[in-house]
Regions:
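Long, compositionally biased low-complexity segments enriched in polar/charged residues
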Residues: 3-54, 62, 66-119, 126
Length: 126
């Protein structure tokens, strides 16, 4: 049996879709309380990590208007969140993945407008 063919080249449309998801998420943080739990927060900020991983594959020209959209979404996220004492995935995961507050800042922030369930779960993050 032949092995499957290697994946094709990355598609900038996939990156644009991730940026659209990130922009929608960040715009919501500014207008309403974050009403979900820690698992959802992790999923939401993981989108930004996927964007970081894809960015080196495309120029700002290839990204088109989405380059500016990403910049604006990042600013919106920063304005609607606060520094968190640890990586929201925990120190062990941050160490293993080599995530830092400088490079992977989305993993070291939590919503300003939160909820009690999320805050209780964040209190257990080590």
């Amino acid at each position: 049996m032949k092995p499957p063919p290697p994946p094709g080249p990355p598609d900038v449309a996939d990156l644009r879709e991730l940026i659209d998801q990130w922009a929608e998420f960040t715009s919501g943080l500014a207008v309403a309380d974050y009403s979900f739990d820690l698992d959802n927060w992790l999923n939401d900020v993981d989108v930004r990590e996927l964007i970081l991983e894809a960015l080196p594959m495309f120029s700002r020209e290839e990204m088109g208007d989405h380059a500016l959209k990403l910049d604006e979404a990042d600013k919106a996220f920063m304005a609607a969140t606060r520094d968190f004492k640890n990586c929201v995935w925990g120190k062990g995961t941050a160490r293993k993945e080599k995530w830092t507050p400088q490079k992977n800042w989305w993993y070291f922030r939590t919503p300003l407008r939160s909820n009690s369930q999320l805050e209780d779960e964040l209190a257990t993050v080590r």
